[in-house]
Each structure stands twice: as C-alpha cells, then as structure tokens.
C-alpha cells in the first residue's frame, strides 16, 4: 500500500509550489533516505525499517527552495535534489548528502549546493557552494554520484563561468574528504550555445565505482541535441589528464547528392588536422 511521505501538499502546476524531486537512497543498515522540494522548502524524511514506516515530521534542509527557475537559452530548468548515502568503508560511512541548484544568490547567479548530515538526517550542514567561480554566472542541472568503494563524491553540472553570453561548458566537482572541500574541473572539451526554442532535457547523470567515473550530459548546438560522456578516472582527475573521446566523428554532408549547395558537418573532440575530399556523381 502506498505511503504518503510529504506533510505539506503542493500544487499540480509543475513549479516551485509542486512537491517534486524525491530520489531515495539506501542507508547502511536498512534505512531509506529521501529529500524533495516543495512549498515547505527542501525537506528530508527517513525510514529505519526498509521503508515500512517513516519519520513523522519533515526535516528542513533549507526553509525555501525555488527549484523552478529560468536559465537563458534553456527552455526550462530545475534545481531538484539528489540524495546519496555513503556506504563505503571510508571515514564518512553513513553520511547522507543532498545536492541541488537554486538562485538564492540572485536570478543571474544560479549555483550548485551540497549539504550533508552525519547524524542520520537529524541535522544538516549549512549549504556549501559547489561551483568555485566568482558570483554572477549560471551553474545548473547538476547530478551527484558517490563511489561506494572510497566515499568520493562527484557532481556534474553545466557552467557558464567563462563567458559573457550563453556559451555553456560542462564541469565536474569532486570531493575526497566527505564534502568538506570540492575541486572543480572542466570536462567538456568545447562550449556550446543552446537556444530555448529546442527542448534541452531536464537531467544530467553520473556514476562512479572503484575510481572510474562516467558523467552523462547533453549538448545543444545549431538546433540539434547530442548525448556525451567523458572517460574519466580519479587518477586522471588528480593529474588533470583526460579527454571526452579518443576519435573524431565521421564527416556528414547534406543534401547528398547535391546539385548546388552542399553543407559539411563534423565534430572534433580534440585539436587535429581535417581533410575533406569531394567527389562528383561519377566518383571523380
């Protein structure tokens, strides 16, 4: 039988007054932890018996969470939370982490945040700003993973710190000390310029295990979306040596065949020479 968890009901119009973003996480001894956003802020509940019964009151991580906000060039955006518990044999075993985004620092300054609890969700740390750039830029659509072999935290997000327009990079923030400090590094090789006339999607994602990290994100350029990853390891991050791909894509021409104008499209994942050979219909 379904169990209602939220105490404060939300609207059904899909904005910050709607109860959304519940992503459960298992604890080390049969606990289930979940955080979500709604009219009562960013809140948390837990079960100590594998979800059979739940805590009676919502614990506020932050009192106000406007998760529905605008990002220039993106048709819609959200800052809904992700919950993870450290099940690793590290010193941070049992720590619960919640990651989200919001515009608490201003409509032109979207940021990524992280809070943690070391007492089973009873109390929460003050939000830690994940992105380490100067104020005034947009970071958005984050997702978090925890390597359960060592307790390292990884957060992937879109980032505009390097530009004055809507050009967008992809960054990874990671912590090796239980979320006390985070290192930021750019993992997308080139920026892209999205347009709000094309649906961009609502999520990134990331997994990590035994020092291997695989983030997933979307690029939107020239009206077309594509899905990307990066081939990363913790040792590469430490050495700042990584690439998003090893090989370049095949050159595509359109229309094909062509009578007058013909356009060529290709992507370079790293700096390299490009050679294009054009043949007529007879193969010459």
Go through the PLM ranges and name each one.
Residues 97, 171, 239, 263-265, ...:
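Beta-strand secondary-structure signal
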Residues 233-247:
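Low-complexity, Pro/Thr/Ser/Gly/Ala-rich linker/spacer regions in secreted
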Residues 243-284:
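C-terminal outer-membrane/trafficking sorting elements
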Residues 1-236:
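Extracellular, repeat-based ectodomains that mediate carbohydrate processing or recognition
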């Amino acid at each position: 039988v379904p169990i209602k968890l939220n105490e404060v009901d939300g609207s059904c119009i899909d904005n910050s007054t709607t109860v959304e973003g519940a992503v459960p996480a298992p604890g080390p001894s049969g606990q289930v932890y979940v955080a979500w956003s709604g009219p009562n802020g960013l809140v948390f509940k837990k079960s100590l018996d594998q979800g059979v019964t739940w805590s009676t009151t919502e614990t506020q991580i932050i009192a106000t969470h406007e998760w529905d906000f605008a990002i220039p060039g993106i048709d819609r955006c959200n800052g809904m939370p992700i919950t993870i518990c450290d099940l690793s044999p590290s010193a941070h075993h049992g720590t619960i982490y919640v990651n989200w985004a919001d515009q608490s620092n201003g409509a032109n300054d979207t940021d990524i945040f992280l809070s943690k609890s070391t007492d089973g969700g009873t109390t929460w740390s003050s939000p830690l700003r994940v992105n380490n750039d100067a104020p005034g830029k947009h970071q958005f659509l984050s997702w978090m993973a925890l390597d359960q072999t060592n307790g390292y935290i990884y957060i992937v997000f879109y980032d505009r710190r390097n530009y004055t327009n809507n050009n967008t990079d992809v960054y990874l923030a990671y912590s090796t000390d239980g979320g006390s400090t985070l290192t930021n590094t750019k993992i997308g090789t080139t920026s892209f310029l999205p347009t709000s006339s094309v649906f961009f999607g609502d999520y990134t994602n990331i997994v990590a295990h035994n020092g291997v990290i695989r983030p997933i994100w979307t690029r939107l350029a020239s009206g077309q979306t594509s899905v990307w990853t990066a081939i990363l390891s913790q040792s590469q991050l430490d050495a700042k040596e990584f690439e998003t791909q090893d090989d370049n894509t095949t050159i595509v021409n359109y229309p094909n065949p062509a009578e007058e104008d013909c356009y060529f499209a290709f992507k370079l994942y790293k700096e390299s020479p490009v050679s294009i050979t054009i043949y007529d219909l007879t193969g010459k």
